[in-house]
């Protein structure tokens, strides 16, 4: 059982982030959700969490490219929920193209959302966690924090950066009751992955079906997508007392991808 009672999960209006938020809510944690999407859809998911798990579920529209909004989100969570026990940096976007065709503005946007946002959120949350002598920071990286794939220069660079940032902050807060870890999923059939299938097909000159079978699942010896529920269960475990000695870890959950 987790001793954490409150959690911020960025990028939690769909996909992996929503799965983690729901897994936390099932443990009785109150939540600060964050992400983009149709307001009606976001409100539907927020209310579903409240109704199903009987927890508080707030929503912040903070833009992960704007440091001040990220800081204000953390401050609001602390003020309205009473603490920030867990921070999950999950927000992420993707773009697929050869480097000579990669738009510089896409590079900047991916680095801002996939890497810098985690820095700004941790910078705001760590003092609050130090004050209560407890905290769990979970950065959602990727198998691409450990290996590379062509045509994903910004994403791979950002995820490798998340791995380094995770280790550095873990060392800084090791005696403060705070753990910092990165979860590195393989391919999960989320909206983010589904959106990149056509781009990958175009970049490689193959069909979308071939992308799924020969590119995505080819990397994973289990030949199946990792599930959101599996990632949520690992995230929950990292918040429990039994995970207190796990820190600075880069944890693969990738169907054997990085065992190659």
PLM region descriptions:
Residues 174, 179, 246-248:
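Short, small/polar-rich loop/turn modules that mediate ligand/substrate recognition or access, typified
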Residues 81, 119-122, 134, 222-253, ...:
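C-terminal substrate-recognition "lid" of short-chain dehydrogenase/reductases
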Residues 127, 171-172, 244:
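Alpha-helical segment proximal to the catalytic Tyr-Lys
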Residues 142:
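Residue(s) in the substrate-gating loop at a strand-loop-helix junction
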Residues 13-15:
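Conserved glycine-rich cofactor-binding loop
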């Amino acid at each position: 059982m987790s001793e954490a009672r409150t959690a911020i999960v960025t990028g939690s209006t769909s996909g992996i982030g929503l799965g983690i938020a729901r897994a936390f809510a099932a443990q009785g944690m109150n939540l600060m959700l964050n992400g983009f999407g149709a307001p009606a859809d976001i409100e539907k998911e927020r209310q579903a969490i409240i109704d199903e798990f009987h927890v508080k579920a707030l929503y912040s529209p903070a833009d992960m490219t704007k440091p001040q909004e990220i800081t204000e989100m953390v401050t609001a969570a602390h003020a309205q929920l009473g603490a920030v026990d867990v921070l999950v940096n999950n927000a992420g976007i993707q773009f697929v193209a050869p480097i000579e065709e990669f738009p510089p503005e896409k590079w900047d946007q991916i680095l801002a959302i996939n890497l810098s946002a985690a820095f700004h959120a941790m910078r705001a949350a760590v003092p609050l966690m130090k004050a209560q002598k407890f905290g769990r920071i979970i950065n959602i990286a990727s198998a691409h924090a450990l290996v590379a794939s062509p045509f994903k220069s910004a994403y791979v660079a950002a995820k490798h950066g998340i791995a380094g940032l995770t280790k550095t902050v873990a060392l800084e807060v090791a005696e403060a009751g705070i753990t910092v870890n990165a979860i590195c999923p393989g391919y999960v059939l989320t909206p983010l992955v589904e959106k990149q299938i056509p781009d990958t097909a175009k970049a490689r000159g193959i069909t979308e079906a071939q992308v799924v079978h020969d590119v995505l699942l080819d990397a994973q010896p289990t030949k199946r997508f990792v599930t959101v529920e599996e990632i949520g269960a690992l995230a929950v475990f990292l918040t429990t007392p039994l995970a207190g000695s796990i820190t600075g870890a880069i944890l693969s959950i990738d169907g054997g991808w990085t065992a190659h």
